[in-house]
Amino acid sequence: MEEIIKPVSKELLKAELTEDRRLRMTNKSNNQIYIITHQNAPNVMREIGRLREIAFRAAGGGTGLSMDIDEYDTMEHPYKQLIVWNPEAEEILGGYRYLLGTDVRFDEAGAPILATSHMFHFSDAFIKEYLPQTIELGRSFVTLEYQSTRAGSKGLFALDNLWDGLGALTVVMPNVKYFFGKVTMYPSYHRRGRDMILYFLKKHFNDREELVTPMEPLILETSDEELRTLFCKDTFKEDYKILNTEIRKLGYNIPPLVNAYMSLSPTMRMFGTAINYEFGDVEETGILIAVDEILEDKRIRHIQTFI
């Protein structure tokens, strides 16, 4: 494990967070959302790399390097970084990186050069019909001090703020119809709890078209029969009650991002789970969300407020 780099000077960060890179104000907390790249804001990128590595290590993942910056952040046509900036404290609350489907390059074999390409296989149907209208999201993080379990009300809105940013992207890029991303579970999470969550997601959100498939699908440790007996209800709501109760019995909670995605859209598609051996063996579940099928209250909150 390398020692994490020291914080980047606030003056250097502010110099790179220029008005032309500001996307919007957030609905809550009066924070600001910026979009940068490694090329136009190298100091902000270093600070993102530092904060990501701290957050992911604390959860049981991470690269083990002094900061989490990889070739997808730094390549010639890199992922863009969407960050939430607290102008009062002059610090980054959290962020995502993203790539527009129309900006995706392909390798010599015709496979898309995506941060998830080493874990998932993308069907021709996905590449032709979905990818050009998709934003791929990754490396979602909330800075440790702003995580709601630690920060109380200060952290409550960090994820909410991030989604204001994603909502704004769909407005400034109206051709975007889908978000493709991953839900991450950590090896430290209770194994039976993980199996229950993944079984529940598969039961209610399974993608039957096999648009995207894990190259090495994760095998659950709990028997299918046991999970089928447990989640025996007809509706998402009833099964969700069971899931929540059972996870709490284990002394755990459903991870916040898993909860958040499930409540975003009833038509979310789940593509199965792969182990990310390059990132602390975390378990990544691929998901696709259609922008126009995001539940109305969420759409009003994160998208309409920007129009």
List PLM regions with ranges.
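Conserved N-terminal entry element of GNAT/NAT acetyltransferase domains
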Residues: M1-Q39
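Short amphipathic alpha-helix that is part of the acyltransferase structural core
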Residues: M25-D70, K80-L100
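Short, well-structured beta-strand/strand-turn elements
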Residues: A59, S66, P266-N276
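Conserved donor-binding loop and adjoining core beta-sheet/short helix segment
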Residues: G64-E71, H77-P112, H118-K128, P132-V142, ...
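A short helix-loop-beta-strand connector motif used in the catalytic cores of GNAT acetyltransferases and
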Residues: D73-I83, F106, M268-R269, G280-T285, ...
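Acyl-donor binding region in acyl/amide transferases
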Residues: D103-T267
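Short intrinsically disordered coil segments
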Residues: I113-L114, R301-I307
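C-terminal/domain-terminus segments
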Residues: L156, R269-Q304
